[in-house]
Amino acid sequence: MSSEDRHLGSSCGSFIKTEPSSPSSGIDALSHHSPSGSSDASGGFGMALGTHANGLDSPPMFAGAGLGGNPCRKSYEDCTSGIMEDSAIKCEYMLNAIPKRLCLVCGDIASGYHYGVASCEACKAFFKRTIQGNIEYSCPATNECEITKRRRKSCQACRFMKCLKVGMLKEGVRLDRVRGGRQKYKRRLDSENSPYLSLQISPPAKKPLTKIVSYLLVAEPDKLYAMPPDDVPEGDIKALTTLCDLADRELVFLISWAKHIPGFSNLTLGDQMSLLQSAWMEILILGIVYRSLPYDDKLAYAEDYIMDEEHSRLVGLLELYRAILQLVRRYKKLKVEKEEFVMLKALALANSDSMYIENLEAVQKLQDLLHEALQDYELSQRHEEPRRAGKLLLTLPLLRQTAAKAVQHFYSVKLQGKVPMHKLFLEMLEAKV
């Protein structure tokens, strides 16, 4: 196989929990991935998009001067043609690949539409069993348990709440427990034909989530855990090395995540690249911000890698710490929910300030689609706050400013040459400067 066809097959004030390290990725295309889940084994953005492989600290595959004649873009297109030439080669990180239908409850592969929602057999059976048995559950925690394929059995209460939240219909379950063909749903009677019915049935307090929000929720990557190098003594080098590795691994997931945004794969390959190259740091910082919401004046760079002000000062990250903390406080004040967080990530990507957009009309359509989805969500879930969508959108300029500070800081770290950087992170830095 030619190189062009290659593809993706922390001390003071911080603490490291003894958690398992973050998996490299669930995608088969990461077969050439390094064990740590970083991007150096096959090259950075080039690995994801099919470019020539290089090791750590080698010259970047592209500069930030534009996309014309960009070898990264050429390899991106090679990736799309290679999948047509050889069906055995799966370019899983090709951004215009069509994602499989996922269960909106747990993220497993959906077997079809059950009770009005794309869902897997396990969640379908769980919902049916709960309704037929009239079972009531209670959450031992705070009714906010994460429901994934691996953890869907850990909390039945939160799993059932998730079923209802994504739109599963109770009336779709046969209460007589009789097996048979599909149940026929009759159209609801008009109120004038059945005034009694209109008096007895009241609308639910909250409507099911919009499809776009549901898709974004199930597309969220697994939780991220730090992997501090054991052979580096405690200090600024170890902290920066850990953060650079975390960023590199998150970028790998980010490329996969982007193709699950409805409408994103309709853009040209060049525009997909432009948006990612422009907005990646904003998306990463949003992740840090959301993880940090439960803490007081601390930043959660990963689930198990948390820095306070003193540690940030010792490792030279005090200015960046204060900038990100400003965002954390702003989102805390807004009491941002996870549904809003995933929408903001998608909007940050679509609202990129890239100068190299080929089809502005198509990008504008994507922006309009996501803006409308946010508005619909806020109207259905937060109707008592009619200006909430606007307040959330007004946080994006501060997010962009903070991302610019982060890029400049890590680029200066790169120029010093003391901290190793994996290919993907290195190349994305080059694209932003």
Curated annotation (Swiss-Prot):
The keyword Metal-binding applies. GO terms for biological process: cell dedifferentiation; cell population proliferation; embryonic placenta development; in utero embryonic development; inner ear development; morula formation; negative regulation of DNA-templated transcription; negative regulation of stem cell differentiation. Acetylated by PCAF/KAT2 (in vitro). Residues 1-41 are annotated as: Disordered. It is found in: Nucleus; Cytoplasm; Chromosome. CDD domains: NR_DBD_ERR, NR_LBD_ERR. Pfam families: Hormone_recep, zf-C4. The record marks 185 as: Important for stabilizing DNA-binding. Residues 208-432 form the NR LBD domain. Residues 203-433 are annotated as: Essential for ESRRB transcriptional activity and interaction with NCOA3. Keywords: Acetylation, Chromosome, Cytoplasm, DNA-binding, Metal-binding, Nucleus, Receptor, Transcription, Transcription regulation, Zinc, Zinc-finger. Residues 32-41 have a biased composition (Low complexity). Signal peptide: none annotated. Its main location: nucleus. Binds DNA as a monomer. Interacts with NR0B1; represses ESRRB activity at the GATA6 promoter. Interacts with NANOG; reciprocally modulates their transcriptional activities and activates POU5F1 expression. Interacts with NCOA3; mediates the interaction between ESRRB and RNA polymerase II complexes and allows NCOA3 corecruitment to ESRRB, KLF4, NANOG, and SOX2 enhancer regions to trigger ESRRB-dependent gene activation involved in self-renewal and pluripotency. Interacts with KDM1A; co-occupes the core set of ESRRB targets including ELF5 and EOMES. Transcription factor that binds a canonical ESRRB recognition (ERRE) sequence 5'TCAAGGTCA-3' localized on promoter and enhancer of targets genes regulating their expression or their transcription activity. Plays a role, in a LIF independent manner, in maintainance of self-renewal and pluripotency of embryonic and trophoblast stem cells through different signaling pathways including FGF signaling pathway and Wnt signaling pathways. Involved in morula development (2-16 cells embryos) by acting as a regulator at the 8-cell stage. This is Steroid hormone receptor ERR2. The lineage of its organism: Eukaryota, Metazoa, Chordata, Craniata, Vertebrata. The gene is Esrrb.
